[in-house]
């Protein structure tokens, strides 16, 4: 990521790459989180930590920043997580349409050995595949993720009973990596 796109978090003051942050806006007195924000959009850029966001809501930090009393839905943080998951799954589906997706164990293993992928998704119901992939991945910079269920991955790619998929190295996989960062950082807390 380019260093010129670093910004201080409006909640904590910590420095993050802009692509790793979430954009919060005020719309009709409601606080909204735009997970699909472009880098040039205006609003409050914050780190994607659920803990920091919930703490800011309790302390009314967003009210102070926007200088008005904001309405915040009870399910605000759950909606952010759902939106981040949906964005990732949509990118997986888009990578299939673009011809950048390997589906199935054999194809993923072959692509891992050829160093042509940098994201691997494994259904969270499967316990055996992770070990097999970890042996091949070693110290390479490949994102291995078990966030989604078999049905979620299957629905995203349009097939039934998909246990694993891999995204080939591309701009799309770089975007997917930054969106996974946001999702994982949000889920950690």
Regions found by a protein language model. Name each.
Residues 5, 43, 58, 104, ...:
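Helical mechanochemical/support elements of P-loop NTPase systems and associated helical scaffolds
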Residues 29, 98, 109-117, 127-139, ...:
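Active-site cofactor/cluster-binding pocket
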Residues 140-184:
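Short basic, glycine-rich beta-strand/loop surfaces that mediate nucleic-acid
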Residues 42-43, 98-99, 117-119, 140-143, ...:
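Short active-site oxyanion
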Residues 16, 51-53, 125-128, 152, ...:
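Conserved nucleotide-binding/hydrolysis micro-motifs of P-loop NTPases
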Residues 51-121, 125:
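Extended interfacial segments that mediate partner engagement and assembly in macromolecular machines
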Residues 185-189:
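N-terminal targeting/trafficking signals and adjacent low-complexity tails
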Residues 1-68:
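N-terminal cysteine/histidine-rich coordination modules
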């Amino acid at each position: 990521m380019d260093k010129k796109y670093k910004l201080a978090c409006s909640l904590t003051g910590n420095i993050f790459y802009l692509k790793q942050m979430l954009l919060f806006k005020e719309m009709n007195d409601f606080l909204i989180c735009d997970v699909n924000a472009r880098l040039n959009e205006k609003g409050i850029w914050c780190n994607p930590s659920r803990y920091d966001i919930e703490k800011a809501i309790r302390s009314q930090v967003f009210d102070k920043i926007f200088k008005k009393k904001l309405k915040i839905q009870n399910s605000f943080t759950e909606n952010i997580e759902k939106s981040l998951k949906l964005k990732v799954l949509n990118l997986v589906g888009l990578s299939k349409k673009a011809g950048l997706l390997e589906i199935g164990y054999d194809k993923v293993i072959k692509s891992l050995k050829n160093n042509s992928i940098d994201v691997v998704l494994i259904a969270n119901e499967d316990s055996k595949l992770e070990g097999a992939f970890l042996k091949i991945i070693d110290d390479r910079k490949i994102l291995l993720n078990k966030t989604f269920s078999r049905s979620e991955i299957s629905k995203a790619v349009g097939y039934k009973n998909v246990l694993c998929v891999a995204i080939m190295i591309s701009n799309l996989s770089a975007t997917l990596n930054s969106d996974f960062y946001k999702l994982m950082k949000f889920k950690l807390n």
